[in-house]
């Protein structure tokens, strides 16, 4: 799920920090001798994702005062910590986002042709989708449904907007496996 440019940046980084060691390339880079750390301990310390993202960004900017930092995430376009990095960016600091294959790209690539979106598609992480304004006229791709509790909250929210029986395509573990998308009713999501 990486471009050659992103992989090269990770291998050459003086300070490589993964949002999570669950990142698909973390183990491969570690086995190749690339030194890195992860921010997995933040998940145990925080219940509020917004607060966690703010503190991740603060820690990353503090680290960047001493070293050039490469921060590896699954999908920079939807990642809350990356949003906070942008929001907290010091005036004299440089922030470069390198392109990669997003979670949405991985999911869309697995969809049958008749379901592949043409035109507008709204991509949003699950933690934001629970409270985001709904637009039933735009196809919605929700990423990062990390646990059953979040899936349940999301299902209840979406059922309020779209109804229980909305045909839904569930793409599980698209970044780690080749599991095929499943056609389900929205009510069965969690």
Pin down the residues of each PLM region:
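Class I S-adenosyl-L-methionine
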Residues: 1-98
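A contiguous loop/helix-start segment that scaffolds small-molecule binding in enzyme catalytic cores
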Residues: 65-69, 131-190
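Class I SAM-dependent methyltransferase SAM-binding "motif I" and its flanking Rossmann-like core
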Residues: 74-142
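Conserved beta-strand termini and adjacent loop/short-helix elements that scaffold enzyme active sites
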Residues: 39-41, 98-100, 126, 171-173
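A polyampholytic, Gly/Pro-enriched intrinsically disordered region
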Residues: 56-64, 113-128, 186-190
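Short gly/pro/ser/thr-enriched loop/turn and capping motifs at secondary-structure boundaries
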Residues: 23-25, 44-46, 102-106, 130, ...
């Amino acid at each position: 799920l990486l471009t050659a440019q992103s992989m090269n940046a990770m291998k050459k980084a003086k300070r490589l920090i993964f949002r999570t060691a669950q990142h698909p390339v973390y183990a491969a880079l570690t086995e190749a001798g690339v030194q890195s750390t992860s921010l997995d301990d933040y998940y145990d310390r925080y219940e509020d994702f917004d607060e966690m993202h703010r503190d991740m960004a603060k820690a990353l900017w503090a680290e960047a005062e001493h070293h050039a930092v490469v921060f590896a995430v699954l999908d920079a376009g939807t990642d809350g910590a990356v949003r906070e990095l942008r929001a907290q960016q010091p005036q004299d600091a440089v922030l470069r986002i390198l392109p990669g294959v997003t979670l949405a790209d991985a999911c869309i690539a697995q969809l049958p042709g008749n379901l592949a979106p043409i035109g507008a598609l709204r991509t949003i992480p699950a933690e934001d989708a629970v409270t985001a304004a709904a637009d039933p006229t735009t196809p919605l791709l929700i990423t990062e449904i990390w646990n059953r509790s979040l899936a349940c909250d999301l299902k209840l929210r979406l059922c309020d907007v779209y109804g229980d029986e909305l045909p839904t395509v569930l793409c599980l573990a698209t970044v780690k496996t080749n599991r095929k998308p499943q056609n389900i009713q929205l009510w069965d999501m969690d």
